[in-house]
Amino acid sequence: MILDEFVEIANLLEIYSSLLSEKQKEYLEDHFENDLSLSEIAKNNNVSRQAIYDNIKRGVALLYDYEDKLKFYQMKKNIRKELVDLKEDFTKENLEKIIENLL
């Protein structure tokens, strides 16, 4: 898994974690936020590494499914980009344009 994908999943987890089961949330947080390996998570939870892998895989698929439907992460990225652009060139016209784009 490349770093960009890892960061994206961590961001999706931040937004959508409340929609996951407690175990999926726990396993995903351990893996993506606490940087634990699958083996470490399996040992801590007295389950097989394969069970952790399957749960994480399903959890990640759910996160992407929620994002495809709700697009909260994309909206967050768009707002951030617009604010960075505004910071670089602040004018009343640019502010109005950005507000219009965000609405």
Swiss-Prot record:
Might take part in the signal recognition particle (SRP) pathway. This is inferred from the conservation of its genetic proximity to ftsY/ffh. May be a regulatory protein. HAMAP family: UPF0122. Belongs to the UPF0122 family. It comes from Fusobacterium nucleatum subsp. nucleatum (strain ATCC 25586 / DSM 15643 / BCRC 10681 / CIP 101130 / JCM 8532 / KCTC 2640 / LMG 13131 / VPI 4355). This is UPF0122 protein FN1394. It comes from the Bacteria. InterPro entries: RNA_pol_sigma_r3/r4-like, UPF0122, UPF0122_fam_protein, WH-like_DNA-bd_sf. Transmembrane segments: none annotated.
